[in-house]
Amino acid sequence: MVAQIGPRKPRHTRSASNAADAVAIMDATHTERAIIIGFSRGVQRGLLLAAHQERVQAAVFIAPSYPGGGKVPQRIAFEWGDELDSYEGWAKYNKHYWLRDHRGFLEFFFSQVFIEPHSTKPIEDCVGWGLETTGETLALTHLAPEMQPEEAREMARRVRCPVLVIHGEADAIQSASRGIALAEHTGGQLILLDGSGHAPHVRDPVRVNLLLRDFIKPAPPPRRWARGRSRRKRALYISSPIGLGHARRDVAIADELRKLHPDLEIDWLAQHPVTRVLQAASERIHPASAYLANESSHIESESAEHDLHCFQAIRRMDEILLANFMVLHDLVRDEPYDLWIGDEAWELDYYLHENPEQKRAPYVWLTDFVGWLPMPDGGDHEAFLTADYNAEMIEHIARFPRVRDHAIFVGNDSDIVPDAFGPELPLIRDWTREHYSFAGYVTGFDPADFADQGRLRHEVGYRDHEQVCIVTVGGSGVGGHLLRRVVEAFPEAKRRIPALRMVVVTGPRIDPGTFAEHEGLEVRGFIPELYRHLAACDLAVVQGGLTTCMELTATRRPFLYVPLRHHFEQNFHVRHRLDQYGAGRMLDFDLATPDAIANMITQEIGRSVDYKAVESDGATNTATLIAELL
């Protein structure tokens, strides 16, 4: 068991009571011994707990608030209880300022906790948590008696268990000298992190996780080893689980890659709903996939009625991405691969650039969009945040160009939006041309195979006299509101189009049984080869995901697409690309009443279209680029 010792709800108390509480918890949970981890002032509680030698197996102290290591210079220039003429910098660490401007103090304090560039997310989180209490309550916590230096040193010298001290050298809250002193006084191991601030477990979590693991439970050496020349040629493929579009194109790329390297074995690190596509294609899903935290569930939890703030949802997925990177780390540590392929595998790309020493194989990055873009109603703050994320990515690539051995854009340069990454940042199209190879779009099929519409309709079960409308929202569970809106429109559309047959495809994460029944309307779940049904339809109503829209564009079918509100990729990147092809008709969900949808279906069904042709060799081109690394 690992017990984390940290600050509790504020009250007038000594650290001893916190340590006693921890012992009581161990007793209640029948935990004989524990490894304790203390952060900042929680280290003082940890020292008290470590005095119970029979209960503490080992202790880890991160950025310790350890009085035995001297004072923190920048924090002793002002007295906490004095009224001051002005409150700038550390003068804000003051009772009167806390009572006057609690938010102002939090914003300053956490800007000092997270001194690392591009720390907007943890600062935002911590300020939000801090606002759950008040300046008055915070001031009360400061009245508790402080641990004195000699008392702290005495406790440290009594510690008999193994100790690891982790401290950022740039810590602006607790000087690194305190961590150095604590390691010396406990006889513990000291790890100093250059450039890290007060919370390295937040800003350098991979490094801290690995330090914890090596200290607590070092990995045993592998029992078997194979000489390089006797190893099978292997690739690890990570496909984005947000929707199903990535999975379909990735299977097509994998098929082409095997044609170029017939001896190549491909393992997939994947989660639902991607696993449904992989299972249908008889691909090998690595058993480690069972340990992945599900990203689609998070995305669904972030959505409202046809509304998904995609940028913020991914920002708030940070703990999931970290957990999944650690799964990947353990997998590639134990099993050698000749190649890693990540199709919008954000966890892999971000944490590799943050920890380039963890790269163990050539790595290919695939994406169909470049650049986070702000939604108009997000104002200046959202524009600042997206620019900050873009700047971090640009800096990653500039500092560590060797991390991505290939960066492949799934499309052409004209598909890239003309916007800039942000103020004083380059144009997205210009930067992408310099840093990516272009493979063309990957459909996973040849549109020429569907030239005989009559035969195709017969194969998928549609009769010649029917006017077939397919309604689908991809592989996530976010699109349920659009499906229900279209189902509401069906009776009126059917009245206007007597031959109408509507097929609502819910995908693997929406229950088909939750929809109303009508004659001429059928509701189906996951369809493995949905693109064939789309190619055979007379009209499709879809959400706005790139894959489905491009499948319809490639097969020249008329379609209505309804982008999710606040989904920057669907509203900007996908819409721009479809405009290049002259494809689809965009419909605003706010205006898409059942009557409006019925009217649009009546206008669009069976309409002849003249889209720009979509290339059919994208998968081959992509595989050829990847094969260069094998």
Where are these predicted regions, by residue range?
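Catalytic active-site module of serine/aspartate enzymes centered on a nucleophile-bearing elbow/loop
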Residues: 187-227
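Conserved nucleotide-sugar phosphate-binding/catalytic loop shared by glycosyltransferases and other
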Residues: 260, 264-315
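Donor-nucleotide binding loops and adjacent catalytic segments primarily
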Residues: 422, 440-539, 590
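Active-site loop/oxyanion-hole signature of alpha/beta-hydrolase fold enzymes
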Residues: 1-41, 210
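Short beta-strand/loop motif that positions the catalytic acidic residue
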Residues: 159, 165-167
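Conserved alpha/beta-hydrolase catalytic His-Asp/Glu region
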Residues: 88-150, 155
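A nucleotide-sugar donor-handling region in carbohydrate enzymes
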Residues: 373-377, 381-477, 507-509
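Flexible "cap/lid" loop of the alpha/beta hydrolase fold
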Residues: 51, 59-96, 561
